């Protein structure tokens, strides 16, 4: 089992195929290898890839789903005419999804090993890997224009107040339209007084529980009963969004992430746990990709920053962009 060639996503990114064909080939070869090597984690990995394939192939439901999200956009435009806000939706990109899957394997095995000085069973690992709920995600980003509130601190406070206000109504609004909110199971439980008690168990609050890299956001997961799939909603102020997209949470975080991954590699003796070894190696290979050298249909890059992604390989597929600019650019709002 140890000697077999390890199948990686990187092997399929240089032949001009579409993202869908890449997924198909990768999942097929990984499954064959998993069966012949009796690698149960690779079988779970295959099911994960098939889930993404299914999303890309049968995505008609996204029209109906994003229509319901749009109703919340209309509600906000009516309730908060003085706020600027944007709604964005995306299907997680193939490279990010693959990185996240392998990252989960590495993180879970490392944490388990640190605690118990042994490795988790495949069943335990399988349970952990069964919780991908954010392949589809929508984000609401709000901003209070300067012309309404001059003072920076006061503006930030107002935005956070409105963010929690929106969080308080979002759950019921979507549940009335065929979604079911998933309890967060105590993860990043909010301590904010602005969040209503009855919705608190459903939110993961990265505002009252800021990540070390400065990432701040409110997350809630829903099950779409008509599409039979999960989707995540993220709520951020523009400042929080900037930190996530172009700030330390994006760049410095990358350096720190590599450092902590190397620390995990050093802690787990090579050859003792093939699931860790392979997931770590796959993750490292993805991080070392030179995007300009890839040959994928509808994808091009000049370097790892200048990217034109028309297929959801690296950036994710856009479902909806809606922008609402504050209607009152001159009048100060009381």
Task: Pin down the residues of each PLM region.
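Nucleic-acid processing machinery
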Residues: 2-334
